[in-house]
Amino acid sequence: MSARLADVIEVLDHAYPPRFAQSWDSVGLVCGDPEDVLEAITIAVDATPAVIDEVPDSGLLLVHHPLLLHGVDTVAVSTPKGALVHRLIRSGRSLFTAHTNADSASPGVSDALAHVFGLTVDAVLEPLLGVASLDKWVIYVPLEHVAAVQAAVFEAGAGHIGDYSHCSWSVTGTGQFMPHDGASPVVGSIGAIERVAEDRVEVVAPARARAAVLSAMHAAHPYEEPAFDIFALVPPPGDVGLGRIGTLPRPESLSAFVARVGAALPQTSSGVRATGDPDMLVSRVAVCGGAGDSLLSLAAVADVQAYVTADLRHHPADEHRRASNVALIDVAHWASEFPWCGQAADVLRSHFGTALSVRVCTIRTDPWNLGARRVNDVSDSGRDQ
């Protein structure tokens, strides 16, 4: 029972495309040879010494948080992270990271979080804007030359939409221009305004074919200076991006929902805290695995009653509480991302079946390991103004 590391990477890159990662992030293979043969995969949020202890020799450790996120100028064994890298390499173990690409993927980190709360996801809190891969060309062509220009740009790769080819749209109008000294007009005279019946021809083409379409258009167009526009088409928002919005099976009080959150997540020393009217009804919820205070403004206008995330700081939470009735539920960072480990395991098991041993490491890697609370020390019935 085994698989090549390269085959596992292919599956992970399909599930959590690297192009979804934030520009500052570090994702993918950290150490290991893609041609290595694996017999086991261990999944965790963090790569720590205790977690690595559970990874079999020649196995893969798949983690959410990058071990080497910021600029690194040494992996000497005398450094904490360097020592981990050396341990992995010496024992033939590999390390792979799926971080913000897993945050934005569908399903991804926030989908897993929503699932453990019993939410049915129906929207993305902050959709990921796609990279423009298509251009729309608008070309103004004298009527008698339209067919030739269309044929040329189609041959260069334009005009394909799904299973259709030679697609275009046109409308007739009037073009106007005045040739000046040095021009060699096909139509009109130097110094005289000329008006010509022209078609506005629109076609789409892959952005990668821009140079070919431009060359073909120039070659077929009768004018020495054709009038044309190129618009980069941004894909509409889809089901990928940060955070998710979902609906509970039935409304429940905020206090009941907070209890639901606490029961669904692994216990941590910081537990679960919330702000809002305990008796308010909650039916629609926004969630974001990991640090999510950057999405507070979106949660405030998302038609939800509550927002679950991690690492909420005092001032952003205070400003939100003053301006919005959306309840905030703050959980431990590690706990909010741990459900993703099970999701990633399902992805791998569904592809490799019994050919690979896939397990989730249950070691709590939350850095906070102690906590204390003195009940009734502080009133929560109001605030100082």
From Swiss-Prot:
GO CC field: cytoplasm
A single GO molecular function term of this UniProt record: metal ion binding
Entry keywords, A to Z: Metal-binding
Binding site for a divalent metal cation 1: 64, 103, 337
InterPro entries per record: DUF34/NIF3, DUF34/NIF3_bac, DUF34/NIF3_sf, N-reg_PII/ATP_PRibTrfase_C
Binding-site list for a divalent metal cation 2: 65, 333, 337
Keyword Metal-binding included in the entry's annotation: yes
Subunit field text: Homohexamer.
Similarity comment: family membership: Belongs to the GTP cyclohydrolase I type 2/NIF3 family.
Protein name in UniProt: GTP cyclohydrolase 1 type 2 homolog
Naturally occurring in which organism (per UniProt): Mycobacterium leprae (strain TN)
